[in-house]
A protein has these predicted regions:
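Short, well-ordered secondary-structure micro-motifs
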Residues: 37-39, 67-71, 93-97, 130-134
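Short beta->alpha junction loops
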Residues: 55-64, 124
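Short N-terminal or domain-adjacent regulatory/targeting segments
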Residues: 1-21
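Glycine-rich phosphate/diphosphate-binding loop of Rossmann-like nucleotide-binding domains
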Residues: 14-59
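C-terminal binding/interaction regions
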Residues: 96-97, 101-156
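Conserved active-site and cofactor/substrate-binding residues in soluble primary-metabolism enzymes
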Residues: 19, 34, 38, 42, ...
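Glycine-rich phosphate-binding loop
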Residues: 69-106
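Short beta-strand segments at enzyme active-site cores
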Residues: 57, 81-85, 116-123
Length: 156
């Protein structure tokens, strides 16, 4: 019997400790809901795996609408970090690029203003619907990024 834990179990254990006591707020886009629903579930599942609590979930019509909801969550004392979950699919124009760039920029500004992490779990731009379905794990990565940054900023 091997008494030393393998690298996989060490990583899982250290990540679970990392998320302990973290309270997250989710902002979820309803546009492309078939995809963002999967992303939301995966994000919640990963937060629970890491020992974090999803304290609040706000639904917004689209990615462009995320900043105001993120601001409301960031104002709360019971939210340590915000995870933005959305999916922007390429159309006939550059609309997808404009939406993602402006939303990402404003979410970054809010993170700096409130001194709390805001992680992007937004797939796109320049993504087809099949591409977006393959990238639902962006939500999982965003949850992990929010928790890691929150923990690394503690005590500074």
């Amino acid at each position: 019997m091997d008494l030393l834990p393998n690298a996989r179990s060490l990583k899982a254990t250290s990540l679970a400790v990392l998320g302990a006591m973290a309270k997250l707020g989710f902002v979820v886009s309803e546009f492309n809901r078939d995809i963002t629903y999967q992303m939301e579930l995966l994000g919640k599942e990963h937060a629970a795996f890491l020992g974090a609590e999803v304290a609040h979930v706000l639904y917004v019509p689209g990615v462009y609408d995320m900043p105001i909801a993120a601001r409301r969550l960031l104002r709360r004392d019971d939210v340590d970090a915000v995870v933005a979950i959305g999916c922007v699919i390429q159309g006939e124009t550059a609309h997808d690029e404009v939406v993602v760039q402006h939303a990402a920029r404003k979410l970054m500004d809010l993170s700096l203003e409130y001194d709390k992490p805001v992680a992007l779990g937004i797939s796109g731009p320049r993504m087809s619907r099949p591409d977006a379905h393959r990238r639902v794990d962006y939500a999982k990565r965003a949850v992990e990024a929010a928790i890691k940054l929150m923990k690394r900023l503690e005590g500074i």
